[in-house]
A protein has these predicted regions:
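Gly/Ser/Thr-rich beta-alpha loop segments that engage phosphate groups in nucleotides
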Residues: 34, 181, 185, 265
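Short glycine- and Lys/Arg-enriched binding-loop motifs that mark or flank ligand-binding interfaces
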Residues: 28, 179, 183, 259
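Short helix-capping/linker segments at secondary-structure and domain boundaries
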Residues: 93-100, 202, 317-320
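Right-hand nucleic-acid polymerase module
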Residues: 2, 78, 83, 87, ...
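A common structural junction motif
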Residues: 236-244
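Conserved polymerase palm-domain catalytic core
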Residues: 44, 51, 103-104, 109, ...
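A general structural signal for alpha-helical elements within enzymatic catalytic domains
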Residues: 53, 94, 153, 200-203, ...
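Conserved two-metal-ion catalytic palm core of "right-hand" nucleic acid polymerases
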Residues: 1-148, 156
Length: 347
């Protein structure tokens, strides 16, 4: 593909910045930093535009917090103004990243996502007797800045835009010269693109057919066990030498024994929630029960959240489990939340 130029002017376009603001504030309009930005919206957008165009815009005003869902992760979140810029960049550039993905990559893509990845993996589980699971150790913290930037240079020739991208990449370090902040919108696209080179290695050099990749979780299937072992070793060598990444130990098994993937356990004949997903689901349902009883959440918002949760587990054998969770609710909150849950159980 040809490298693209004249990108920075498109990103700094007033209409694009305003669109980016609306995208960034979606679902967060009541937060203090969003309200403060909105009170001086026009002047803030003019300032961002000016600094983007004159090259003085700087990233790095981060704050950190830890989540434990399902495992411990340190999230690095930019302030709201920077998030507007992230959205402004991706409004223009998302299509360029999308065009460099191949069909079996499912993260950060419209029309793809977790459920699509699971459905494709479930199909392969029925066809192939063996699977190999590959996972990058500390993926976001291990992404090499120089390697990533060289990849972006192959996409764009706008020097001012590339300087902006370098300042964004260089604003965060897990160790010197490495790491992307998990909380940034741009990080999700950059990280997914980083591994697109290994996707092409799998398909073009190893001629692997049955693949599912969701960010740094890579799953391969084959009829022959030794074929998977050889391809896994060659893939590991490639990412070590070319992407400077380290893989966790391989998980090689028969499909009939089940594939642990993305919060589920996939068998040839059925898909089940794994133990940690069941635990998180039960905890969240109890939280909504308490919030409803205390009028801490509106029924409509609760319904939206619960429907989203049910959408996540829709591909699994789950209805008996969900009914068991419902029985544990106290009466007052349950009467309200049950109406939502009963509806979910019928879809």
């Amino acid at each position: 593909m040809k490298r693209k130029g004249y990108i920075l002017e498109q990103i700094a376009d007033p209409d694009n910045l305003r669109h980016a603001y609306w995208n960034a504030q979606t679902g967060k309009s009541a937060k203090k930093d969003v309200i403060a930005f909105r009170e001086h919206l026009d002047s803030n957008l003019v300032m961002i535009r000016s600094r983007l165009l004159d090259g003085s815009y700087r990233f790095g005003n981060y704050h950190y917090f830890t989540i434990y869902d399902p495992k411990e992760r340190v999230i690095c979140a930019a302030d709201f103004g920077e998030r507007v810029v992230h959205h402004a960049i991706m409004n223009i550039c998302a299509v360029d990243f999308e065009n460099r993905q191949i069909p079996f990559s499912f993260a950060c893509r419209k029309g793809k996502g977790t459920l699509a990845a699971l459905k494709q993996a479930a199909r392969y589980q029925k066809i192939y007797p063996w699977y190999l699971k590959l996972d990058v150790r500390k993926f976001f913290d291990s992404i090499d800045h120089a390697v990533l930037f060289s990849q972006l240079q192959r996409m764009y020739k706008d020097a001012r835009f590339l300087n902006l991208l370098w300042r964004l990449i260089d604003s965060y370090h897990s160790i010197d010269g490495k790491g992307l902040p998990i909380g940034n919108l741009t990080s999700q696209y950059f990280a997914n693109h980083y591994l697109s080179y290994s996707d092409k290695y799998l398909t073009e050099q190893l001629h692997q057919k049955a693949i599912v990749r969701y960010m740094d979780d890579v799953f391969l299937w084959a009829y022959d066990r030794d074929e998977l072992i050889e391809k896994g070793q060659r893939f590991e060598n490639y990412v070590q030498e070319n992407l400077l990444l380290t893989l966790k130990p391989f998980v090689l098994n028969k499909s009939e024994h089940g594939l642990p993937a993305l919060g589920f356990h996939l068998f040839p004949e059925e898909t089940r929630l794994n133990a940690s997903s069941r635990k998180r689901f039960a905890q969240k349902m109890k939280q909504y029960d308490i919030m409803l009883k205390n009028d801490a959440i509106k029924d409509t918002r609760c319904a939206q959240n619960i429907l989203s949760m049910y959408g996540f587990i829709a591909c699994a054998k789950h209805k008996g489990f969900a009914r068991t969770i419902v029985k544990g609710f106290d009466a007052e909150g349950s009467n309200r939340v049950n109406r939502v849950i009963i509806y979910c159980l019928t879809i």
